[in-house]
């Protein structure tokens, strides 16, 4: 079956199943191309919460499909590749988080959405890279537990005087971008602003001309007068950047910026998931209700 045939078959199945296809900005180009909506974790969470579709096909990783199930329990949520996990999300367990909470009684837990549903259920509020600063600034407490991304936590800490108890988690893909590589690129391309994701190492973030979520990158590059940009996030973002700003050049800061989990989902996987209506991701009510509380608190706060 050719890619074009696959795409038209997927479109037909989406219509037949009254399904919506959500794709994260880091997905393969051809998957983003057929998506009804592409976006970052926050945009896709909002979409999952408000869609009229009966079925949500989530092209992303496991925690994202869980978030869709938490926010839209009446929908069928399909994750074409059940093995598409997130190493960062796996770096925090419910048991370890409970231990930290016991050591710091009364200190609220702010959890990055890159976490399991069970961890969200132990949290006071969630955040994404697009709203993290506003989420933390909205809290009256003077100290917080921030999990699981130490890099995002370090970045947010710059904008507040709160005391942070940082979890020692990180994104292996973003962590691979080294400051010395960025310095060389900036020297070789002095006209190109370096735009990076706050999941990058703090030493890389210090070199950035602009730090933002993936959605923030699209907006920044569109509005900027610059014609060339050095991009410090996962390679999947390039497809939409080039589509939205075809007259501009985008230099990926490192060939190592590829997330193997985000690249697992193929058009064949999407087709099979729709055809067989499996694998389904469903969060149990006992976890869903407290996790939804943390997500709802986040969704009430405007994004950056």
UniProtKB/Swiss-Prot annotation:
Pfam families: NadA. It catalyses: iminosuccinate + dihydroxyacetone phosphate = quinolinate + phosphate + 2 H2O + H(+). Keywords: 4Fe-4S, Cytoplasm, Iron, Iron-sulfur, Metal-binding, Pyridine nucleotide biosynthesis, Transferase. Its cofactor is [4Fe-4S] cluster. Pathway: Cofactor biosynthesis; NAD(+) biosynthesis; quinolinate from iminoaspartate: step 1/1. One of its GO terms (molecular function) is 4 iron, 4 sulfur cluster binding. InterPro entries: NadA, NadA_sf, Quinolinate_synth_type2. One of its GO terms (biological process) is 'de novo' NAD biosynthetic process from L-aspartate. Iminosuccinate binds at residues 24, 41, 112-114, 129, 197-199, 214. [4Fe-4S] cluster binds at residues 86, 171, 259. It is found in: Cytoplasm. Binds 1 [4Fe-4S] cluster per subunit. GO terms for cellular component: cytosol. Its EC number is 2.5.1.72. Belongs to the quinolinate synthase family. Type 2 subfamily. Catalyzes the condensation of iminoaspartate with dihydroxyacetone phosphate to form quinolinate. This is Quinolinate synthase. The lineage of its organism: Bacteria, Pseudomonadati, Thermodesulfobacteriota, Desulfuromonadia, Geobacterales. The gene is nadA.
